[in-house]
Amino acid sequence: MRFSWLEVAVTAASLANANVCIPLFPWYVSSPPFYPSPWANGQGEWAEAHQRAVEIVSQMTLTEKVNLTTGTGWMMEECVGQTGSVPRLGINWGLCGQDSPLGIRFSDLNSAFPAGINVAATWDKTLAYLRGKAMGEEFNDKGIDIQLGPAAGPLGKYPDGGRIWEGFSPDPALTGVLFAETIKGIQDAGVIATAKHYILNEQEQFRQVAEAQGYGYNITETLSSNVDDKTMHELYLWPFADAVRAGVGAIMCSYNQINNSYGCQNSQTLNKLLKAELGFQGFVMSDWSAHHSGVGAALAGLDMSMPGDISFDDGLSFWGANMTVGVLNGTIPAWRVDDMAVRIMTAYYKVGRDRLRVPPNFSSWTRDEYGYEHAAVSEGAWKKVNDFVNVQRDHAQLIREVGSASTVLLKNVGALPLTGKERKVGIFGEDAGSNPWGPNGCENRGCDNGTLAMAWGSGTAEFPYLVTPEQAIQSEVIKNGGNVFPVTHNGALTQMANIASQSSVSLVFVNADAGEGFISVDGNIGDRKNLTLWKNGEEVIKTVASHSNNTVVVIHSVGPILVDEWHDNPNITAILWAGLPGQESGNSIADVLYGRVNPSAKTPFTWGKTRESYGAPLVTKPNNGNGAPQDDFSEGVFIDYRYFDKRNETPVYEFGFGLSYTSFGYSHLRVQPLNGSTYVPATGTTGPAPAYGSIGSAADYLFPEGLKRITKFIYPWLNSTDLKASSADPNYGWEDSEYIPEAATDGSPQPILKAGGAPGGNPTLYHDLVKVSATITNTGNVAGYEVPQLYVSLGGPNEPRVVLRKFDRIHLAPGEQKVWTTTLTRRDLANWDVEAQDWVITKYPKRVYVGSSSRKLPLRAPLPRVQ
């Protein structure tokens, strides 16, 4: 049965069987139920924090626990999301969650870091960690408890997906390692990291009903990403396993449906995969307005509702007082709310929030010094809301380093590095210059004016400044006594031709933008319409190249673009991809162009000749009547380079490719089996669901006398001892059997899954089985970094040709040799067995490959048989 939207909006005991969907067409997949929601047990490094959480939650009343689980409403307090508080026990203000994965959104005096996709291009674990730690320091200094990042969803199934730049790479191993290092950095700075968007959030269009309807599409449910179990485990779940193993405190569930069940009430993905199989000990928070039911979401594994209201500023909540009603009437077991509160407080203690916490010293809603305490309704005290705390520290230096380390040299025919002696330097393209409205002149960066250093949406930050390529290069040229001629209007082709014909070197800057689906730029509804350059970029390149035989092209983009029609033009002597480098953009690219930094970046995605080279297109039209658009992941694990390999298609630039100002050689591959332990499937049962504290009567949870009620603020208290009246649910009184799934409220001991047993999954998955070493030699005349990459062939008839498993970034002086040594774990060599519901190393022969990209693998050897 489906409720009307209004009925759903006011119910506290809404349809709980969140995984039973009756699709319009019978062949559509549905997500199997998995209940009850596993309770945290403090495994591994979580033990101390878990015990402290249990101690404080045991002292909380029901409404205090509920207050931790529910945001107070959009724009009700300083942060984009803020829970209720528990002042009686020292939590004097609610937990503050704030965007984004690359810096602080809606703030000031903060840094704008390079995007996640740039971190992936560095292939550098240390830089990923340092960037995470620097961001965490800034969030902590602003009084933020929870950073809403990093992202591994979207992973990158679609090269034109709107938010792939927020994450890292379409390869799960590369993403997983850098995802985990970023999380460690953020949390070592004392801030809870949020791994998002869990899971299969691979496109923007149709992610939300109201958003789609605003664009003229009459759908009633959000898009469903339909995936098989093997693909889920081997591709999309892989980096989230790394995040859980790294100790991430929060995971954000996504807007989309997974196999026709909403991401924030999908018991298969939340209860089974995340909490039972991966042993996640932190809390699951909803994406903003991705919460679709009361009891259903609670039983399916959601722990925190953000921002608390159903629609922004409507004053209604699935949880809050409705959660209190649900516990009192027995539809939500008390142990489930206890577990929510324990999970939240465990993450809080694990990162040290109790030691480091200061109140938020900024307002997301105004840059003015003073404003109302509750901005959405202009109520509460008129007070100082912005302290203008500068949190940037010395992070500009790191930002510049990551920017240059992530610049991929795709082509170089003797053009680079520049000598500094070039007498006339032409700079071409709007992407070289400033946004005439200012670097933050477009709300949420929702435009493409000037140089592209950050894409658009909630995954953004406010620039403290933006060094453009024009500024940095002009300074360089003038310092060296040269002349510089910028033409930064893409329509000025005549002027470009004139300047190019006179220039010693012509530097062309072009871009391609994308972002979140609530903003449309030039008809790009978050996702890109195509993979071409924006603002006449191809014509700018062709114009300059036809008048200059030393044309260097620099691309700022959110992902791959089509370069096949111009990349091999002999007048184009160099091509660089600089991604989205953040505030130090110009300085970063100048460091590479002038040779202060030897480029070492490798492309974290494949550059195809056409959009069709990548496989299935985005779902851009409803394909299920007015119901949920269906996105079938029928390609399985074959995305990006795996898909190109399967089709034997030669890309323009393969995954992992990147040039240097020096050269490297690979030799002496050695493969040695280790005495790894035998794989032991997890067995046994959990303990029973623990309960902390006691539950009183409805009268104990009435709205406190004398407390001034703020309009639309989400409270945990009841308005009446009549639970039906307090819930305002027109369907109140249904029998539990009508809407509560079987076993959903069962708090008895539960079997431990074979693939589970510890955070990240079965601990024997991570045992080293094989040691691999290779010698890397700098055969050139310039010191530099090389990124050795290790790929494995898993051998099965339906497996990718190779899959990335290990990598590193190694510095070598001219002529220097180093032996790179790494290991392969059981997980690296295993496949997911759907029938056994476990990881299995198959009988098929396996091989290991080492080289500088997915297509340049000069070293190869068979792998020994291991189990």
Curated annotation (Swiss-Prot):
GO MF entries: beta-glucosidase activity
Subcellular location(s) of the protein: Secreted
InterPro entries in UniProt: Cellulose_deg_GH3, Fn3-like, Glyco_hydro_3_AS, Glyco_hydro_3_C, Glyco_hydro_3_C_sf, Glyco_hydro_3_N, Glyco_hydro_3_N_sf, Glycoside_hydrolase_SF
SUPFAM superfamilies reported in the protein's UniProt record: (Trans)glycosidases, Beta-D-glucan exohydrolase, C-terminal domain
Active site: D287
Annotated signal sequence range: 1-18
Top EC category: hydrolase
Pfam family, one: Glyco_hydro_3_C
Main subcellular localisation: secreted
GO cellular component: extracellular region
Family: Belongs to the glycosyl hydrolase 3 family.
Protein name as catalogued: Probable beta-glucosidase A
